[in-house]
Each structure stands twice: as structure tokens, then as C-alpha cells.
Amino acid sequence: VEPDVVPDVVVVGSANMDLVLPVQRIPRPGETVLAGLMTRGPGGKGANQAVASARAGARTAMVVALGDDEGGALLRDALEGVDLSLATTADAPTGTAIITVEESGENSIVVAPGANRELTLSADALATIGQAKIVLSQLEIPFSTVQAAAAASAYFILNAAPAAELSDELLAEVDLLVVNETEAEAIAGPDRSALLKKVPAAVVTLGGAGAVILTRDAEEIAVPGVRVEVVDTTAAGDTFCGVLAATLAATSANDSITASDLTNAVRRANVAASLSVQAAGAIPSVPHGDAIDARYAEVYL
């Protein structure tokens, strides 16, 4: 990271090459289906979220492990606008995700983590994490690395995806949890308000229905979704997380993110996600700040 430029947002996360297979429907166990034309492109929850944060206007750095291979080189190019001075090259191959996408836009994904399994935090990475306004992680990297990033952060957002059971020790370091309904249930069971026993604030995303904000000092706040024609849901959740982080970094002092700050940020993130599902692919579908702001004005102002 440039010595004088402290990033607003540091993403500690995964980067994958996505192999996308368009199918009429996702195969059931024991079933073989034929796909259309396979495409490959850059993705991974961390990379998608870092690009979303940068495009939304935040100075963004990424701590990531890439392979010394074609996929790693393509990802470095794809992470436009993201500071990669803390990226490391691992002995393992770059992570790969195999994504089947139905005509409806529904998808299923299998990830081979590769280099992402080897992501650890250097002293430089920890120092930068400690200075950033917002640090954002997901669960496609080792939990020990997530825990170390959380412990070093001023304000730590965990997108607990893919769904997993998390230790209370890790959750104790989380300032804001972002989960979908499946992930929320994995952590706190069917009653989502139980999340607040584990974290001080949470955003539960509801797909096209928007999101709800849970905080300990306010009633549950529902933020309705933005109705759009869905082309491809890949990276919608990642766009949401990256734009949420970027917006919180721009609107709040570190120590006092309020329910109204969260509401504003979730609205902007909702708008960004609604734009991303109208385009195909992961990183290619992530919107830029001017498009987000124009649509935000139409929807909310």
C-alpha cells in the first residue's frame, strides 16, 4: 500500500477464476446435463467485493493469495482500481469456481480454493488493516486469517459466506455481520434476531426482497428491494457487500456507525445489487458509482 495513502476499505478475501456453464437446469444427483458455451472470467467473493468497493468510490486495497499462473495474471488485471501491493503469490494454483447457471438466472457453485487456502497476513497487511476505516472479509479463506484480520480492525464487516458454523471467538470480533437467510440460519437458527446475541449489528439479505437491518439499539429496519429483470445473480451479494463497505467508509466516523448510516448504506448496496443482476458475469456485472448514484436518486430520492 502506498505509504501516504491509507485505504478506506481493505478486503481480506478470495480470488477465483470462474468457469461458467450455462444449462437449461442445474443437474440433480446422478444426472448429467449438457451445457452451452463455457466462459471463463475473474471472480471469487473477495475479488468481486473489492472491485465493487473500488467502483463505488472507496480507496480499496486487497489482501489476497494468487497462483503463479494464467488465472493469477488475469485476476491481477481484473482487479482494476484495487491496490494489490499486499497481494501474495502462492505455490498453489489460483482458486477456481465452477458455476452452473440456469436460464432463470439461478446458479450453483463448487469452489476449489487453491491459493486462497494459503492466505496469511504479513506485518504490512496487519498494519494496513489496522489503519483502514472498514475491513471486509468472507469465508473462502482460512478462518484463522479472518480471525486475525478481525482482531486487527477498527470496524470489521464479515460476509459469512459460504454458510458455516462460526466460533463465538470469531463472532466476538465482528462489528457488522452480512448474511443471506441460509447463512443466518447456520449461525443463529431460524430466529434471525438471535444473531444479535452474537454480533452487535447484522444485515440479512433477502434476494429480490431487499434486506433487513438488525441492531441492538433499534427495531428491525426493513429496506425493500429494487424490482428488476434478472439476467444473472452471480456477484449480486458481493456487489452488495462491497458497496455497503464503501458507503459506510464514506459516511461514518469509525467508532459511531449508526442505524441511519446503515440504512443509507444498505439502500445504496441494494441499488448496486439490482444493477449487477441485470448483467452477466461476476466482475463485469459490478456497477460504477455514477450508475449507482443515478439509480439511487430514481429509487429513493
For the regions a protein language model found, what residue spans apply to each?
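Conserved phosphate-binding/catalytic region of the ribokinase-like
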Residues: 1-8, 165, 192-301
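Alpha-helical segments flanking ligand/cofactor-binding loops in enzyme cores
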Residues: 51, 76-77, 147, 151, ...
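Hydrophobic anchor at the start of a short beta-strand
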Residues: 9, 59-60, 84, 156, ...
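Short gly/ser/thr-rich secondary-structure transition/capping motifs
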Residues: 81-82, 114-120, 156-163, 223-224
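Conserved N-terminal subdomain of the carbohydrate kinase-like
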Residues: 17, 29-33, 37-40, 52-134, ...
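Positively charged, low-complexity intrinsically disordered leader regions
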Residues: 1-27
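Conserved beta-alpha-beta core of the PfkB/ribokinase-like small-molecule kinase fold
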Residues: 133-193, 201, 209-211
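Acidic-glycine-rich active-site phosphate/pyrophosphate-binding loop
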Residues: 18-30, 212-223
